[in-house]
């Protein structure tokens, strides 16, 4: 059965997550990305495979609620985000690629 994707893969993956925890997961072959909140696991898998040219073993997602922040007009709210932890079958992704300065 063929699946048709309406979203461009580059619209699904927003950016890689840079944190201590995500760096630790890279050694296990797991990469963390911030993704479009409306994207599902199948769309995330398709996007990773087409952007980076690797095979994905599994995708775990988590929704992070926005933090409550104080503004000069009272209390505000940051927007909620969605993250995906992608496990690869083989290969690796050069997320922080480019020449070093």
Swiss-Prot record:
An example molecular function term from Gene Ontology annotations: rRNA binding
Any one GO BP annotation for this protein = translation
Gene3D superfamilies from the entry?
3.30.70.330
Query: Which Pfam families would you find in this protein's record?
Result: Ribosomal_L23 (PF00276)
Coiled coil (UniProt feature) = none
Q: Look up keyword Metal-binding and say if it applies.
A: no
One cellular component term from this protein's GO annotations in UniProt:
ribosome
Q: Which SUPFAM superfamilies does the record match to this protein? A: Ribosomal proteins S24e, L23 and L15e
Q: Which InterPro entries match?
A: Nucleotide-bd_a/b_plait_sf, Ribosomal_uL23-like, Ribosomal_uL23/eL15/eS24_sf
Keyword list (alphabetical) reads:
Ribonucleoprotein, Ribosomal protein, RNA-binding, rRNA-binding
The family annotation for this protein states: Belongs to the universal ribosomal protein uL23 family.
This chain's function reads:
One of the early assembly proteins it binds 23S rRNA. One of the proteins that surrounds the polypeptide exit tunnel on the outside of the ribosome. Forms the main docking site for trigger factor binding to the ribosome.
Q: How does the annotation summarize its subunit structure?
A: Part of the 50S ribosomal subunit. Contacts protein L29, and trigger factor when it is bound to the ribosome.
Name listed for the protein in its UniProt record: Large ribosomal subunit protein uL23
Organism listed in the record: Kocuria rhizophila (strain ATCC 9341 / DSM 348 / NBRC 103217 / DC2201)
């Amino acid at each position: 059965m063929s699946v048709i994707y309406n979203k461009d893969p580059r619209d699904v993956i927003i950016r890689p997550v840079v944190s201590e925890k995500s760096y630790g997961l890279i050694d296990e072959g797991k990469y963390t990305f911030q993704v479009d909140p409306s994207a599902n696991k199948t769309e995330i898998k398709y996007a990773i495979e087409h952007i980076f040219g690797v095979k994905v073993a599994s995708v775990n997602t988590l929704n992070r609620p926005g933090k409550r922040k104080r503004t000069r007009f009272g209390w505000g709210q940051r927007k909620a985000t969605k993250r995906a932890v992608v496990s690869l079958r083989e290969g690796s992704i050069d997320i922080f690629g480019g020449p070093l300065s």
